[in-house]
Amino acid sequence: MPVQWGIMSTARINEKLLAGARQTDALAILAVASRDTETAGRYAQAHGIERAYGGYDALLSDPEVEAVYISLPNSLHVEWSVRALRAGKHVLCEKPLGRSAADVDAAFDVAGREGRLLMEAFMYRHNPQTQRLVELVASGTIGRLALVRSAFSFAGRDAADIRLRTALQGGALMDVGCYCVSGARLIAGEPERVGAEQVLGGDGVDVAFAATMRFADGVIGHFDAGLALDSRDELEVVGEEGVLFLDDPWHCRQPMIELRRDGKVERIELEPVDSYRLEAENFCAAIRGTASPLLGRDDAVAQARAIEALYRAAELGQTVTLA
């Protein structure tokens, strides 16, 4: 039986989730909520969604909604995740789940008490391209791991964009840099210390962010992210005996891993698959008890802890050691 979902907000990111949802029978989008009934109604009609609510609490009061997808501004992620969990709903919350490790950890406490699933939505983690990359590194294909370098940026020119508002926890690190942090952690483990620089825009939000991270065994991580830079989207994993390069590591639209070794280049191509569909299917299977969630508490808390440390390093202008 498909899991009955409600969508909290009418954000643009929903389009990608809805496209993935149409490809699977694991879920059904039953309801959508916005801050006002008219907006929710128009959205529901445009997307063939049965129920529309003018207010998020109204959606949470619907007894037939089993799970919610939260795509609200970053500053509201933890708050509404907790409210949804307390209302008895399972929660798939868009990344980043939170900027505070303590807040994220507390949200998982609520999930545990309520017997509900909470998962952070990093869709790229579900894609076979990502899983193949991890396998290649783990198998020693490039020898001992030495460096993880990545970038994610685009030129955001709309001053009204919520991603450019400090009060809503926008910014380069929270919006796109979080992918780079997640990817480095996936490959190299948890950072031991970090250093960072940021460039602030008119609202005091970081429009450019660059960081260096030190991992165990002398592995170095470096990334840069931006909301006012030309579009860049890449991940490079360097070992003592080779390099793995991805020119679309996060969206995974045309999955391909380039292996550079011994002066030769091998292109490992994979079949394209919708990451959002895979994410939704894993979430639903975990709800039904037929699979474990790919992303859980430990990963989400560690991700928030790294982001906290990176912001602190940028603000202080010095290296920050993680406990």
Regions found by a protein language model. Give the residues of each.
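N-terminal Rossmann-like dinucleotide-binding module
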Residues: 1-47
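C-terminal helix-rich "cap/oligomerization" subdomain common to oxidoreductases
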Residues: 1-2, 67-69, 105, 268, ...
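Beta-loop-alpha module in the N-terminal Rossmann-like domain of NAD(P)-dependent dehydrogenases
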Residues: 47-110
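Hydrophobic residues in well-ordered beta-strands that form the structural core
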Residues: 53, 92-93, 118-120, 149, ...
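Rossmann-fold dehydrogenase core element
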Residues: 105-124, 143-146
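Predominantly a Rossmann-like dinucleotide-binding segment in NAD(P)-dependent oxidoreductases
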Residues: 124-197, 202, 317
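Contiguous beta-strand/loop segments that form the cofactor/metal-binding neighborhood of enzyme cores
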Residues: 182-252, 270-273, 280-291
